[in-house]
Amino acid sequence: MKKISLQISLLMFLVLLGACSSGPVGKRATGLAYEVVVVMKKADWDGSSGKAIKQELTSDVPGLPQSEPALKITYVDPSQFDGLLTYVRNILIVNIDPSIYTKASISYENDRWAKGQVVVTLNAPSPEAIIEYSQAHPKALVDFFVKVEMNRAIGQLEKDYSTVVMDNLKNNHDLMLNAPSNMTYYRDTTDFFWASNNANTGRTDLIVYTFPYTDPNTFTAEYLVAKRDSVLKENLPGAAAEAPWSQAMSGLH
């Protein structure tokens, strides 16, 4: 009887401990990749400091032929920042208060309200201090969130990846590459490998090709661009062309 009472007491203790414990236990971060919730007073958000933050977070992704923002932002007033909003994966909290802060400073915390979450806090005594900080550290915020998302993707791909891509590249091209697991359609030739998720929306394609090194000009931008164009022209004739590539799309492995 004493043993049963001890077990019941221990069980009740564990239940109470779980009920009283705070933190992100059991809560997973929500939201989509490259989305950030900005928590900031409305007056500041509508003012010059908010404009500076918006311009940085939505700055163009470098290297793309068209304009595309690096991050998608959602604004929330501090008075409404509660509940499910606190579980979002990327959060930026901006505090402007001259009675508390003497200079602009930035910090971050992982897993504050949910696992897999990062919360960045930017404190400053004035809107001008926010602007000065942004000018002194251009793209610091956007680069941080982009790096966080890249690391998340790396961690996910280390655990869950396409064995089709990995096995073909490893066996036929002496390469190892962790591609998204939904990339199961592929075409493989001697010097050219293509994989795709073949999705109607959100389609993702991966291309790997090799060519011989001939002279130092091989590594110039002009040569690499010309080589890329010639390889893709040969292997990707376009949707209108009924070529081996188009046929491969309809009957892939």
Segment roles from a protein language model:
Residues M1-L10:
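Bacterial N-terminal signal peptides that target proteins for export
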Residues S21-L252:
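N-terminal targeting sequences that direct proteins away from the cytosol to non-cytosolic compartments
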Residues L16-A19:
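C-terminal motif of bacterial Sec signal peptides marking the signal peptidase cleavage site
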